[in-house]
Amino acid sequence: MLRSTTFTRSFHSSRAWLKGQNLTEKIVQSYAVNLPEGKVVHSGDYVSIKPAHCMSHDNSWPVALKFMGLGATKIKNPSQIVTTLDHDIQNKSEKNLTKYKNIENFAKKHHIDHYPAGRGIGHQIMIEEGYAFPLNMTVASDSHSNTYGGLGSLGTPIVRTDAAAIWATGQTWWQIPPVAQVELKGQLPQGVSGKDIIVALCGLFNNDQVLNHAIEFTGDSLNALPIDHRLTIANMTTEWGALSGLFPVDKTLIDWYKNRLQKLGTNNHPRINPKTIRALEEKAKIPKADKDAHYAKKLIIDLATLTHYVSGPNSVKVSNTVQDLSQQDIKINKAYLVSCTNSRLSDLQSAADVVCPTGDLNKVNKVAPGVEFYVAAASSEIEADARKSGAWEKLLKAGCIPLPSGCGPCIGLGAGLLEPGEVGISATNRNFKGRMGSKDALAYLASPAVVAASAVLGKISSPAEVLSTSEIPFSGVKTEIIENPVVEEEVNAQTEAPKQSVEILEGFPREFSGELVLCDADNINTDGIYPGKYTYQDDVPKEKMAQVCMENYDAEFRTKVHPGDIVVSGFNFGTGSSREQAATALLAKGINLVVSGSFGNIFSRNSINNALLTLEIPALIKKLREKYQGAPKELTRRTGWFLKWDVADAKVVVTEGSLDGPVILEQKVGELGKNLQEIIVKGGLEGWVKSQL
């Protein structure tokens, strides 16, 4: 089992008094548009952003259809947009090839940079071609946009409506998340990789500590952490629950770009050239974060206490040392070295060193009988480099099955998927049930070296078992959590802080108010909000949507909740699928504002995109749960508490009995600027885009 020693302590701070910014806030400040003069952005603020680049992949055609459906005919800034083909490249059906051709023709017509099937995974292309560049903000309509954080680029995912908005107007919106600091200290043992770090983090801190947070990595270990390791860690901050995973700009990163420039063999690359690297060196001299920057929490892990870790089966929240699993004699049927997580050159070489440790192709450790080991480079460039280095030949000599540079089995597409009853071990990022094939299969995640060792021995194994070397000494991982709550005394102090009112757009209410109706549960998913059986019925009238809203959660919701009420729920409200009706059904019910401890990211984006307002107030959830502790359980409960949100003052007040009753809670919240108000006034992001054309 996973063993660790964790200490928890806390200190207090108040957002209202903080002037400084962390690195995430600094980058957002640079890419925010139409801010009021002198406005300094912080976590919680809603801002309009104009990202440096926006990438979409096989979903580019649905984005294009939405773009054209809005009435748009011209890409606002063609150099901002990148399209790639990577997910379903093994599919040679006429339907898929037609879609690919449509994307290619659209890109050509609008002078968009386009990378065809076979060039590589979109995220790797963004890295190799310099679109994701240190200290810029880069988005993509894909959940693993966090990967760019390994290069010091603030990468975060968007939904298709956002992508269409960026195509048409150059911008969309973002609410700056709470920022968690993750300190990596100590020296990583020889052979332990970035994959081991992130798999351990997902398993050790598995109680949603970083859910919907931005992460900033710090620590004395960073200079010794190669860029490929950083990219792997940043990539899987998505599975950890975060919205970004940002590494700082340091000498290791700048040297990586200098080497990249040398490899390109030209000084005329549009994004990676002597001028951009010199500018980066100058920017790197500026402090990474202000001394008085605020962080929601700090997590610390001592890398010196790590060993090889494996997650699963079928969950990244379950992690064990490879030594523990090896003793369980877990037989495998398939192994995978593919995806944007771990298919870079160093990953392929790591696996090659396990199957051919001497370098002699006549002394290769063969893949075990009955095991299929699939391998694909993250890009065509990486495959060419692996062929040149000899790593590719070693893997094929061992019996690996090559696949084209693309997503393939990681996304459950193409050859080599898990069959019912099979067990697979993979260097990818997700092992959710059914993700890589059958729902009746078991999937584990591990580093390339562990995957290769397991393929050779036919069971989950450590590299040391293949190489006949000593196992890494292990006695438990040392971790620490420093929480950073806003306490009630500071909440009260916030009201005395110097005020800078938010300007209110004509037609937008200065305040929202209503009685709080409590749906006391965490992780209410989109199916609970709007039943899946209605999702693909396009003709459901508004009245029907209102009737069925929340029926899978509580059939009594329909009669207990009235138009104008404010629904309040627990944490991670709206998790699950991307159905927009989860937001529009609440609007149909007459609910204009939902409050929770936290929201699922896609639900949060779909809400604003459809003009449903949301507020995260964890302190309110705590107070309500204290109020009803020991009371008979009610799924939907009218509380008799009232909330008023003063948008101009960015403050909420909760009272008892009426809006004029005794104050229960008073707290500052993120600012909703004029740009976001305009989206709401226009009925959502699509309406706003149409108004800009």
Curated annotation (Swiss-Prot):
This is Homoaconitase, mitochondrial. Pathway: Amino-acid biosynthesis; L-lysine biosynthesis via AAA pathway; L-alpha-aminoadipate from 2-oxoglutarate: step 3/5. Gene3D superfamilies: Aconitase, domain 3 (3.30.499.10), Aconitase, domain 4 (3.20.19.10). Signal peptide: none annotated. One of its GO terms (biological process) is lysine biosynthetic process via aminoadipic acid. [4Fe-4S] cluster binds at C340, C407, C410. The gene is LYS4. Present with 7350 molecules/cell in log phase SD medium.
